Design a protein with these regions (language model features):
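Short beta-strand-loop/turn "lid" adjacent to the catalytic site in phosphate-handling enzymes
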Residues: 43-46, 61-95, 123
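Phosphate-binding/catalytic loop of phosphoryl-transfer enzymes
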Residues: 83-124
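Predominant activation on well-ordered alpha-helical scaffold segments within soluble catalytic domains
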Residues: 55-59, 79, 98-102
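Short glycine-aspartate micro-motif
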Residues: 15-19, 71-73, 109-112
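Short, well-ordered amphipathic alpha-helical segments that serve as non-catalytic structural scaffolds
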Residues: 50-64
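A short acidic Gly-Thr/Ser loop motif
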Residues: 18-23, 76-77, 114-118
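A short, basic/flexible loop-to-alpha-helix module at the beginning of a structural domain
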Residues: 1-10
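Short glycine-rich, Thr/Ser-proximal phosphate-binding strand/loop in the N-terminal lobe
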Residues: 14-53
Length: 124
C-alpha cells in the first residue's frame, strides 16, 4: 500500500521526518518557512528491509524536491540502527510525538499511539 502527496516548495528550508516502524516506512517533508506546508509524503511497507526502504524514500523525495537546506531526522521502532548506518539524527518516537503534540496542541492531556508492534500512551 502506498500513499504519496507532492506539492511544489517555495523556499529552501525543508524539514524531513522519516518514521521506520515495525512494518512500514513513512516520510514527510514540510516547508519550514511557510507554516509547515506539506511538500511531500510517502508511506510504504518495508518487508523487513528498513535500510533499503529508507534509501528508496529519500531518493523518491529527492527526485521531486531539489533543495539544499534540508533537515532530516529518523524516528520509529526500526529507525535506530538505520540512523546509525546512514549517519542521520535519531529521535525516540515517544519523545518525537510528545514534542510535536505539545507544539501543535497546547492543551493536550493524553495521547495514544497504536503502532504495528505495540501501543504507547503519553500523559502530559
Amino acid at each position: 500500500m502506498m500513499n504519496k502527496e507532492i506539492t511544489k516548495p517555495n523556499e529552501q528550508n525543508i524539514l524531513v521526518g522519516i518514521d521506520v516502524g515495525s512494518t512500514t516506512t513513512k516520510i514527510v517533508a514540510l516547508d519550514a518557512d511557510h507554516d509547515h506546508q506539506l511538500l511531500f509524503s510517502d508511506y510504504a511497507r518495508h518487508h523487513a528491509n528498513q535500510i533499503a526502504s529508507v534509501i528508496k524514500s529519500i531518493k523518491e523525495f529527492c527526485s521531486h524536491i531539489k533543495q539544499k537546506k534540508i533537515r532530516l531526522c529518523l524516528t520509529g521502532s526500526g529507525a535506530k540502527p538505520v540512523s546509525s548506518i546512514l549517519k542521520v539524527p535519531f529521535v525516540q518516537e515517544v519523545a518525537a510525538n510528545a514534542i510535536a503534540l505539545q507544539d501543535k496542541f497546547q492543551k493536550v492531556g493524553t495521547a495514544i499511539e497504536l503502532g504495528g508492534q505495540d501501543a504507547k500512551m503519553i500523559f502530559f
